[in-house]
Regions:
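Cell-envelope/extracellular polymer assembly enzymes that use nucleotide-activated donors
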Residues: 9-11, 36, 188
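Short, well-formed alpha-helical segments that are part of the catalytic scaffolds
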Residues: 17-32
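Acceptor/aglycone-binding surface of glycosyltransferases and processive sugar-polymer synthases
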Residues: 69-86, 103-183, 210-220, 224-230
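Hydrophobic helical membrane-anchoring modules
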Residues: 2-7, 176-261
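Conserved donor nucleotide-binding strand/loop of the catalytic core
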Residues: 38, 50-87
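A conserved acidic beta->alpha catalytic loop
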Residues: 41-50, 99
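Short beta-strand-to-loop acidic/aromatic patch adjacent to the donor-nucleotide binding site
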Residues: 89-100
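Acidic helix N-cap motif at the loop->helix transition within catalytic regions
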Residues: 21-25, 46-55
Length: 261
């Protein structure tokens, strides 16, 4: 049996916050598919940091960083991206720690990124019967706003966090923004990258919502997180209005992010 694909340019980043035992199987599946894999424990209080550190002690392809306090998904990803950039990595695939994202699709997304290094490779979620209808309908609204804010640049799903980012432009964006540190990270990242001319490539990837009896954990809070998304889209709409003339010129002339191929 062949081992995981190894790369000196592309790294898998898994932020984790109170995910419970599911994080172990998620990390093991990611490691079976890719090397290296970096996990950022974002102030978890569930005791998994110790178990992950033990896994990393016996695995040269696994790195685990433990943050003292919870700062949010975007902050955890930024921590990993800064370290990855310093070590010469150019791209990072982010995936959730709770088993929603398919580790067996890591290689496919990484291959697209290697073939198109100037693009962001976005997972396009394929839902099964486990997907909560309210969540599916809610993301349609957010995706419609994203479509407007990017002048239909081709982002199939702005919320699905299984994706490959070019590291350098995303780190620069995060350093310039006080936001994008929590649930607003995934959507704002792809919108601002598109504004920078980073073209999206969409790749189908199944998503699975685990039940509580399967160990599924959700930190989504309907009121709090929808308020955060509403504020985010207000910011992005203002940014869109300021950038509209240049986006129109890019679309007419076929410049990134609108250029195909």
């Amino acid at each position: 049996m062949s081992g995981p694909a190894m790369s000196s340019t592309h790294v898998v980043v898994i932020p984790s916050y109170d995910t419970g035992p599911l994080v172990y199987s998620t990390v093991a599946a990611a490691r079976a598919a890719w090397s290296p894999v970096w996990v950022v424990v974002d102030g978890s209080r569930d005791g998994t940091a110790e178990g992950l550190l033990a896994m990393a002690a016996g695995d040269a392809g696994l790195r685990v960083d433990v943050l003292a306090k919870n700062s949010g998904k975007g902050a955890a990803v930024l921590h990993a991206l800064e370290a990855a950039l310093a070590q010469g990595f150019t791209h990072a695939l982010t995936m959730d720690a709770d088993g929603q994202h398919p580790a067996d699709r890591i290689a496919a997304l990484m291959a697209e990124s290697t073939a198109h290094p100037d693009a962001m490779v976005l997972g396009r979620p394929v839902f099964d019967a486990s997907a909560p209808l309210l969540r599916v309908r809610g993301r349609r609204v957010s995706n419609a706003w994203t479509n407007l804010e990017t002048l239909a640049a081709g982002i199939a799903d702005s919320l699905y966090g299984f994706r490959v980012y070019p590291i350098a432009p995303l780190v620069d964006i995060l350093h310039r923004q006080p936001w994008m540190r929590r649930f607003d990270f995934d959507t704002e990242a792809v919108v601002r990258l598109a504004w920078r001319g980073v073209r999206p490539i969409n790749v189908d990837a199944p998503v699975r919502y685990l039940r509580a009896d399967e160990g599924g954990v959700s930190h989504f809070r309907y009121g709090r997180d929808n308020a955060l998304l509403t504020w985010m889209h207000l910011r992005l709409l203002l940014g869109f209005a300021l950038r509209l003339p240049s986006l129109v010129v890019r679309r007419i002339t076929g410049l990134p992010p609108f250029r195909s191929g």
